[in-house]
Design a protein with these regions (language model features):
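Active-site and adjacent substrate-binding regions of carbohydrate-active enzymes
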Residues: 1-490
Length: 490
C-alpha cells in the first residue's frame, strides 16, 4: 500500500478522519483485562495503515469507573491501571512519528466525587469557598429532607444527592459525578491549567464532553419547572440548564489558550443542541467545531441522509468551520446493527435499537447481511462528504452491537438507576473489547496477552472470531479493506 499522505497544515482538522479510541476496550498490554495506553502504542502501525489523520482518546484519567472514566478524579494524570505519564508521552511520540495527531477527551461539566476539590467541599461545609466550586443547595421540607427540586438525572433517578450535613449537590448524570459551578473562578482556572497541561504534553486537540451544559442559571424563575432530562430544547439560549449563551464566554477563554500554541490547538464540541444553535460552538472564536449526530439517529432513508447532509453543511457555512459526520461512537448502538434492524417510518430508530438490546437481541430480526451492505454504503457516503469524519473503534471491522451481555456483567450506570433498572440496558454493547486475532487461545481474541491474569472487562461473543483484525487484513473484500481503501482515496 502506498504511503498515506496526511496534512501538516494548522487547519488539518477541517478535513480529517479522526478515530475514536475507547482506551479500556482497545488493547490490553498487561493482562489486567483493561485496555491501556501502551496497548494503543503497540497498535500504532495498525492505525497508520488504516489511514486515519488523528486518534481521539476517551477518558484515561484516574477514575472509579462509575461512568466509564467520565467520572474524573484527576484531570492531569493517567489512571495507573492504564499506564503512566511516560506511557502517554511515548504514545504521542509514536503517533506523531507517523503523522497522526492526538486528541483527548476533556470533561468540564462534572468531576468525580473523588476529586480533591469535591473532597474539600465536603470537608469545608456549608457556605465555604470550597463548596462553592460545586452546586450545593439546601433541601426542601421541614428538615431539608427533600431535594431542592424534583429533577431527574439524565441517567435516571434523582439529580440530587444529600451529604452528611444535610445539603444536596447537583449531578446531572450519576451521583458520582457532581456538577461544577462554572460561576466560580477556581473552576475556570482548573480547566485552563488542564488545557495547558495536555497541550504541553503534545496533545493536538480536545473533544469537549457535554459542552452545552456548563453554565446554569440556578436563580431562574422557572428553575423548579425544568429538568436535566429536558435536554437543550430551545433556540434562544434561555433554558436554565442547557445551551446558555454564557457558555460561549467560557470557550472564548479556552480559545485564547488554544491560540497560544503553534499550531493552535483544536477542539470539537459534543453539544446535543438544536441545529439553529450549533454554529455558535463551531465558530473560530469558540471551540471551532461541533459534532453533527444526524447520521447516528436517522432511519435508513434517502431523504433522511439528504436532510442531515444539508443541515451539517449549513452549520459549517454559518460558523465558518467544517462539517462533521458521525455514524457511531461510545454512547450509541453500532450503526451496522441499527441499519440491520427494521426501519419503521415515523419511529425513533435509536429507540428501536435500544429495545432490541434490552431484549438481548430477540425482539427484532437483525439482518446482518443487509446491515453490512448499508454500513459499507454509509462509509463511502461519509468519506465523500466535505469536512471531518469521526469513526469509532471497531466500525472498521464491521462490528455489530453485542446485545446479550448478561445483566450481572454490565458496567454502564445508566442500566442500574432506579428508573432504568430492567428497562434500559445501557451502552456496553458498543464498548466490548476489540478482537485482534481470530484464534481464541487466550480467551480474548488477542485483546489481552495469552498469559493474562484477568478476563476482558466485558465479555466478547464467539462471533468476534469472524470479525478479527487479522482475518480482515488478509481479505480484500472485508470491511477493514474497504475502510483502508476509502481513507486512502479520500
Amino acid at each position: 500500500m502506498a504511503e498515506i499522505q496526511r496534512s501538516t497544515d494548522a487547519l488539518w482538522w477541517q478535513n480529517a478522519v479522526v478515530y475514536q479510541i475507547y482506551p479500556r476496550s482497545f488493547a490490553d498490554s498487561t493482562g489486567s483485562g483493561l485496555g491501556d495506553i501502551p496497548g494503543i502504542t503497540a497498535h500504532m502501525d495498525y492505525l497508520d495503515k488504516l489511514g486515519v489523520d488523528a486518534i481521539w482518546l476517551s477518558p484515561f484519567y484516574p477514575s472509579a469507573l462509575a461512568d466509564g472514566g467520565y467520572d474524573v478524579d484527576d484531570y492531569r494524570n493517567v489512571d495507573p491501571r492504564l499506564g503512566t505519564m511516560d506511557d502517554f508521552d511515548a504514545m504521542v511520540e509514536a503517533a506523531h512519528a507517523v503523522g497522526i495527531k492526538v486528541v483527548v477527551d476533556i470533561v468540564p461539566n462534572h468531576s468525580s466525587n473523588r476529586h480533591e476539590y469535591f473532597k474539600a467541599a465536603l470537608a469545608a461545609g456549608k457556605g465555604s469557598p470550597e463548596r462553592d466550586r460545586y452546586i450545593f443547595r439546601d433541601g426542601r421540607g421541614e428538615n431539608g429532607e427533600l431535594p431542592p427540586y424534583d429533577w431527574e438525572s439524565i441517567f435516571g433517578g434523582s439529580a440530587w444527592t444529600r451529604v452528611e450535613d444535610g445539603q444536596w449537590y447537583l449531578h446531572m448524570f450519576a451521583p458520582e459525578q457532581p456538577d461544577w459551578n462554572w460561576d466560580n473562578p477556581d473552576v475556570h482556572e482548573e480547566f485552563i491549567k488542564t488545557l495547558r497541561f495536555w497541550s504541553d504534553h503534545g496533545t493536538d486537540g480536545f473533544r469537549v464532553d457535554v459542552a452545552h451544559a456548563l453554565k446554569k442559571d440556578m436563580n431562574s424563575p422557572e428553575i423548579a419547572e425544568v429538568s436535566p432530562r429536558d435536554g437543550a430544547n430551545r433556540i434562544d439560549g434561555s433554558h436554565p440548564l442547557f445551551d446558555r449563551n454564557e457558555v460561549h464566554e467560557v470557550y472564548a477563554e479556552w480559545r485564547k489558550v488554544f491560540n497560544e500554541y503553534d499550531p493552535p490547538r483544536f477542539a470539537v464540541a459534543e453539544g446535543w443542541v438544536r441545529p439553529e444553535r450549533q454554529y455558535l460552538y463551531a465558530s473560530k472564536d469558540d471551540l471551532g467545531q461541533i459534532f453533527n449526530f444526524s447520521f447516528a439517529t436517522k432511519l435508513w432513508a434517502r431523504n433522511n441522509f439528504h436532510e442531515a447532509i444539508e443541515a451539517g453543511i449549513e452549520t459549517a457555512e454559518r460558523s465558518g468551520s467544517s462539517a462533521t459526520w458521525v455514524l457511531s461512537n461510545h454512547d450509541i448502538i453500532r450503526h451496522a446493527t441499527r441499519f440491520a434492524l427494521p426501519q419503521i417510518p415515523a419511529t425513533d430508530q435509536h429507540q428501536i435499537a435500544v429495545d432490541w438490546v434490552l431484549r438481548d437481541g430477540k425482539s427484532y430480526t437483525e439482518n446482518r447481511e443487509l446491515g453490512t451492505k448499508r454500513a459499507r454504503a454509509a462509509l463511502l457516503l461519509e468519506m465523500a462528504l466535505p469536512g471531518s469524519a469521526y469513526i469509532y473503534q471497531g466500525e472498521e471491522l464491521g462490528l455489530f452491537e453485542v446485545a446479550d451481555i448478561p445483566w450481572d456483567q454490565l458496567e454502564d450506570p445508566s442500566a442500574f438507576t432506579s428508573q432504568n433498572n430492567g428497562v434500559l440496558k445501557g451502552r456496553d454493547g458498543c464498548r466490548v473489547p476489540l478482537p485482534w486475532v481470530s484464534a481464541d487461545a487466550d480467551g480474548s481474541f488477542g485483546f489481552s496477552p495469552a498469559d493474562a491474569s484477568e478476563k476482558p472487562h466485558l465479555p466478547q461473543p464467539a462471533w468476534f472470531a469472524d470479525f478479527s483484525a487479522d482475518v480482515e487484513a488478509d481479505d480484500a473484500d472485508s470491511m477493514l479493506s474497504l475502510y483502508r481503501a476509502a481513507l486512502k482515496l479520500r
